[in-house]
Amino acid sequence: MTTIVSVRRKGQVVVGGDGQVSLGNTVMKGNARKVRRLYNGKVLAGFAGGTADAFTLFELFERKLEMHQGHLLKSAVELAKDWRTDRALRKLEAMLIVADEKESLIITGIGDVVQPEEDQILAIGSGGNYALSAARALVENTELSAHEIVEKSLRIAGDICVFTNTNFTIEELPN
């Protein structure tokens, strides 16, 4: 699988992910870009799960963003509705973290939209719990930037989770 983590701190939101693509217990690729900018660079999105499924969801989510003039929550809820009701979409196995300058969300593989706890930290994927724990400890006990926290959290997850590597893609808003 993978690890995707998002941290919002001091006016910045950062989403980062590793680059490993696995098929069963075999590493197929080590430098996949699982974090991307959508909607003219105003929205960050990262995926965990099946790569082809995630690209389908990226496309669908970007269409929803266009349809709803970039309104993140409305677009996420509309995608989740489609995900639940469309037979083909229901078979997709992926999760997304999406974020803009105002809010961050997880869109789950069963069509739920989840807002973060008060700490504004989100993580998904096989190494998600490791990255989430590390990010929470770093936010609470350091003055590191959101970018530094995401990078350190991914590194910790990559050291523990065999389905996460240390080849990261990290995007942030504002630039």
Curated annotation (Swiss-Prot):
The active site is at residue 2. InterPro entries: ATP-dep_Prtase_HsIV_su, Ntn_hydrolases_N, Proteasome_sua/b, Proteasome_suB-type. GO terms for cellular component: HslUV protease complex; proteasome core complex. The keyword NAD does not apply. The keyword Protease applies. Pfam families: Proteasome. One of its GO terms (biological process) is proteolysis involved in protein catabolic process. It is found in: Cytoplasm. Keywords: Allosteric enzyme, Cytoplasm, Hydrolase, Metal-binding, Protease, Sodium, Threonine protease. Its EC number is 3.4.25.2. One of its GO terms (molecular function) is metal ion binding. It catalyses: ATP-dependent cleavage of peptide bonds with broad specificity. Allosterically activated by HslU binding. Na(+) binds at residues 158, 161, 164. PANTHER family: ATP-DEPENDENT PROTEASE SUBUNIT HSLV, METALLOPROTEASE TLDD. Protease subunit of a proteasome-like degradation complex believed to be a general protein degrading machinery. Belongs to the peptidase T1B family. HslV subfamily. A double ring-shaped homohexamer of HslV is capped on each side by a ring-shaped HslU homohexamer. The assembly of the HslU/HslV complex is dependent on binding of ATP. This is ATP-dependent protease subunit HslV. It comes from Haemophilus influenzae (strain PittEE).
